[in-house]
Amino acid sequence: MVEFEPRSYEDFDPEKRPSFGQALLPIAGMITFLAVGIVLLGLDAQMPLLWGIAFTGVIARYGWGYTWDELFDGISNSIVMGLGAIFILFIIYMLIASWVDAGTIPFIMYWGLEFLTPAVFVPLAALLSFVVATAIGSSWTTAGSLGIALVGIGSGLGIPAPLTAGAILSGVYMGDKQSPLSDTTLLASGVSDVDLWDHVRGMFPNTIIVGVISLALYAVLGLMAETGGTGGTGAEVAQIQGGLAGTYTLSVLVLLPLVITFGLAIKGYPALPSLGAGVFSAAGVSILIQGRGFAEAWQIIYSGTGPKTGVDLVNNLLSTGGLEGSIWVITIVFGALSIGGILEATGVLSVIAHNTAKAVDSVGGATLVTALGPLVINALTADQYMSIVIPGMTFRDLNDEYDLDGTSLSRTLEETGTVSEPMIPWNSGGVFMASALGVPVLSYLPYYFVGILSPILVVIMGFTGWKMYMKDPEESPEESADTAA
């Protein structure tokens, strides 16, 4: 994790620092470019992002007096901040292709179709995703491995893919924010200056409430899918299983890459070596069990899979881009990080945060502003780390002013910053999840209940005072939670 500390409002030269109205100009420009480019012209996001970078750079250079070197430094710092996510993107795309070719994902799909029904599948997909993400501390790894298999099972059972994807994402992001192994959990507690376990305990009320509501909704939707006739027929399921069994050797040994990857993650190994071990072990399984040649196995990891199972649905589900397919995603991430770096380096984000904080006059208002911060930063910078660090550093004094304990701040950052990542189409998380699960962001968004409910609940808690952690020299944060009004 890269150390990053944003500059405060006072750190910027008043001669260069934009006014509030000026700070909104590049934001309005970027929104306009994205809307026109993607919605009206049907372009990929890379071109509108390029327009936004040029527009913001010209304003900052000739309107506010920043040098080209200062702007480039801002871009460089932002990209360095996002390098961890970029490296993980590279390796997860290799992991997905290798696990498909090794038979790992086909094995899970085959036996999932054997035992699951539409009535129980949707809530079970969310619950299983939550358990795995909590255990390994990674939403991306869970979605890029288990999640793909679950989408395949859901499609075989006749469950709409957006519903399955929404349930998976609810599980993986709730597990990610709650896991003490997650980098975002460590980051939120660190930037808020609170003990890690106080932070984890502080999120329990939100996790339980949002989790129960989400599971109930998924159970209802699963039952509706079954009774509404959208569930797959026995003949369709048998056809899919036949296609899988006829193409792959489905020995239990094909689960070895999964066991190695998750085992290393649970033991505390960083994401890159854990995922790398998963790729190398899957290549070995492809060669030894699926009968691939050495060069063939590694070429598939690079260029992706395109199985011919005789079943179109299975062919589509198991077609992957490999390392080569990650380039499209990473160019979007680079573009979004670049414009986010300019916005941070020129004081745009600090000016907006400073002026917003001046309108606060209550604990509820402080919580609302703090909650909006990560949502806005996630949209503007496309980086989950920045969505936690920038609002955390910016609004820490504001939370202190209203005697809010750091645990309240860290919880708000997680309940909005972590879970909102896959809700934004050009954010690194949104781009990856849409690509990996094969479902556009705007299609799964209505079913991503954790992402919708978590920010709402944390704001309600701020205005009602329920389970808000207040500073008290006589009590610990968890004790003050029991007495807060």
UniProtKB/Swiss-Prot annotation:
Pfam families: Na_H_antiporter. GO terms for molecular function: antiporter activity. It is found in: Cell membrane. It is a multi-pass membrane protein. Keywords: Amino-acid transport, Antiport, Cell membrane, Membrane, Plasmid, Transmembrane, Transmembrane helix, Transport. InterPro entries: Na/H_Antiport_NhaC-like_C, NhaC_Na-H+_Antiporter. GO terms for cellular component: plasma membrane. It catalyses: L-ornithine(in) + L-arginine(out) = L-ornithine(out) + L-arginine(in). Its main location: membrane. The chain crosses the membrane at residues 23-43, 48-68, 79-99, 116-136, 148-168, 203-223, 246-266, 269-289, 323-343, 362-382, 441-461. One of its GO terms (biological process) is amino acid transport. It comes from the Archaea. Belongs to the NhaC Na(+)/H(+) (TC 2.A.35) antiporter family. Uptake of arginine from the medium in exchange for ornithine. This is Arginine/ornithine antiporter ArcD.
